[in-house]
Every structure is written in C-alpha cells, then in structure tokens.
C-alpha cells in the first residue's frame, strides 16, 4: 500500500514539475516573440474592411481591448479565432489584422465562411504586421489606454484570453 502511495506521489510530483517547465517555456517563447510597438500607434487611424475608421486609443480608453494578428492560412488561428469571436460577442473591444490573407474580398469571403464578425484591417503585404515586429500568428495584444499591457503568441483559449483581459482591467 505504501509503495502505491509513494508511486502516486512521485507521479504527481513529476506532473507538477513538467507542468511548471511547460509554463516557463511558454513564458520564455512569448517574451522572445514580443512585438514592438510602432511610434504613435495608439493615435493612428486604421480602416477596416467596411472602411470604418478605427483608433486604438479610443477603443482601449474605457477598458482593455484585443488586437489580434491572424492569417486565413494559419492553422493555429483556426482554433484561436472562435475564441476571439466569442469575446467579441461578449462585448470585448476587438480589432484584428489579417496578415497576408488576400485582397479585401478574399478576406471578407473567409470571414463569412467561418461566420466571424470581428472588425478586420487587411494587411495583404504584411506592412502593418512588420511595423509591429509580428513574428508568429496568432499574436494577441491586450491594449489599455493606448498601451500594450499583455501579449501572447500561438494557440490560446477563450478562458486564457478572458483571464488576461480581467488582469489587464485591474491595472
């Protein structure tokens, strides 16, 4: 009986160690891939696919907003985009950038096909993403009062984003 408990304790300890190593590795990768904010980005006017002006400073003034860099060709984005859409449905301010996903009509067709309704700035040549030093998709920035307060790259969940938004609202 004691041998069984000892083995169970050892397994739990190993699981904890591997879990902590995974978290530390994820943090290190996020730090390495940290985007660079372009000068005066918060005041810059962007136009979405419907030609509606979007200003990050205004969108992030009342509460944190999500800036989501994605691509229609990105496999991880296929798992992250539904979470972003769900946050949009929850009334979170979302602005997204479609990186090298085609002309505006191709991006609009993709959004309709996937039933996504978040506002999209098309970045067909990657110039906007390059100005932010985006190295991977998906990349998600949480911006509050015109300042990037959190970021993450790669696969993430609705609840992971929800917690990050909540933590950002506390500062």
Q: Language-model segments: what does each one mean?
A:
Residues 1-47, 171:
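N-terminal targeting signals for export/organelle localization
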Residues 40, 63, 135-137:
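Short, small/polar residue-rich loop motifs at catalytic or cofactor-binding pockets
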Residues 47, 119-123:
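Short acidic-hydrophobic, aromatic-tinged amphipathic segments that line or gate anion-handling sites
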Residues 55-78, 84:
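Short active-site neighborhood of thiol/selenol oxidoreductases, capturing the structured segment around
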Residues 62-64, 90-93, 118:
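Loop/turn elements at helix/coil->beta-strand transitions in domains of secreted/extracellular proteins
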Residues 66-67, 94, 140:
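Hydrophobic beta-strand anchors of alpha/beta hydrolase catalytic cores
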Residues 78-114, 124-130:
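Structural microenvironment flanking redox-active thiols in thiol-disulfide oxidoreductases
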Residues 112-116, 124-169:
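Thiol/disulfide oxidoreductase modules built on the thioredoxin-like
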């Amino acid at each position: 009986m004691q041998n069984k408990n000892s083995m169970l304790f050892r397994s739990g300890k190993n699981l904890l160690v591997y879990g902590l190593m995974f978290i530390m590795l994820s943090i290190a990768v996020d730090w390495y891939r940290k985007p660079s904010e372009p000068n005066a980005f918060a005041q810059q006017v962007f136009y979405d696919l419907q030609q509606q002006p979007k200003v990050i400073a205004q969108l992030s003034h009342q509460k944190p907003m999500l800036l989501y860099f994605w691509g229609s060709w990105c496999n991880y984005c296929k798992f992250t985009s539904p979470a972003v859409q769900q946050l949009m449905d929850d009334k979170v301010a979302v602005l997204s950038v479609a990186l090298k996903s085609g002309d505006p009509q191709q991006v609009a067709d993709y959004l309709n096909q996937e039933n996504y309704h978040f506002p999209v700035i098309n970045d067909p040549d990657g110039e906007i993403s390059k100005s932010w030093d985006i190295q991977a998709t998906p990349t998600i920035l949480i911006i509050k009062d015109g300042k990037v307060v959190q970021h993450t790259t790669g696969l993430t969940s609705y609840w992971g984003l929800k917690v990050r938004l909540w933590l950002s609202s506390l500062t």
